[in-house]
Design a protein with these regions (language model features):
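Catalytic Walker B motif of ABC-type/P-loop ATPase nucleotide-binding domains
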Residues: 158-161
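ABC ATPase NBD coupling module
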Residues: 65-78, 109, 224-227
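Conserved ABC ATPase "signature" region
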Residues: 109-128
Length: 248
């Protein structure tokens, strides 16, 4: 379980997070939504330890993440980055196995390659893809490679940063279904940040809306459409009028 208690972060006079409280239950898929510039990325980076909050506490299974051994802490995570973040100079299998051959794991090359090919198969890519380079793949295939890398080390927790960015609606649907399937299969805890409502409905067990540096609403995805928060309803239905627009 990941818990955030009154987490705040400012950059100069820009108060990005204003005291965020959020619980991500073990084995659940939490999707954090909100408009551009609402602090979703800062929230994610705070959990990962890439940004240090000004105040508040973030715990993983009750332990403060700031006091954890960093290598052991990060070894529990997998992540699918928004832009893929693949290394163009490495073959596909080397991208997938990157963590496996480094850090505390340091698997032999042959073993790491075998795991990489297995994970590529799991995300629907043929074994021959392993010896290609990222630049030879379509955007959708690159996203699948990124997903294979995220799950290669069998992480307990997987983060997804705008997973469908740059994909057409059909490929977005395929990737969303694949993410949901894999998270359930692995029994992983997942956190996704996105503004793509198709991802929300396909991936989430629970949803949290971040607005003006605070969690305005959180609950089951099945309760989202009936929630009485006007900001949430404006966002999920894509309306340009109403409370969100009026405060800008």
């Amino acid at each position: 379980m990941i818990e955030l208690s009154r987490v705040a972060k400012s950059f100069g006079k820009n108060h990005v997070l204003r005291g965020v409280n959020l619980t991500i239950p073990r084995g659940q898929s939490m999707v954090v939504i909100g408009g551009s510039g609402t602090g979703k990325s800062v929230l994610l980076k705070s959990i990962l330890g890439l940004v240090t909050p000004d105040s508040g506490r973030i715990t993983l299974e009750g332990a403060d993440v700031r006091e954890a051994n960093r290598d052991a802490f990060l070894a529990r995570f997998g992540m699918l980055f928004q832009g893929g973040a693949l290394f163009d100079s490495l073959k596909v299998w080397e991208n997938v196995a990157f963590r496996l051959m480094r850090g505390a794991t340091k698997l032999p090359k042959d073993e790491a390659r075998a795991i990489a090919i297995e994970k590529l198969r799991r995300v629907g890519l043929k074994p021959e893809t392993a010896d290609m380079f990222p630049g030879e793949l379509s955007g959708g295939m690159q996203k699948r490679v990124g997903l294979a890398r995220a799950i290669a080390a069998e992480p307990e927790i997987i983060f997804f940063d705008e997973p469908t960015t740059g994909l057409d609606p059909i490929m977005s649907g395929v990737l969303n279904a694949l993410i949901r399937e894999i998270v359930i299969e692995m029994g992983a805890t997942a956190m996704t940040i996105t503004h793509d409502m198709s991802s929300v409905r396909a991936i989430a067990d629970r949803v949290a809306m971040l607005h003006d540096g605070l969690i305005r609403w959180t609950g089951l995805v099945s309760d989202m459409d009936q929630a009485d928060d006007p900001y949430l309803q404006q966002f999920i239905h894509g309306r340009a009028d109403g409370p969100i627009e009026s405060v800008r």
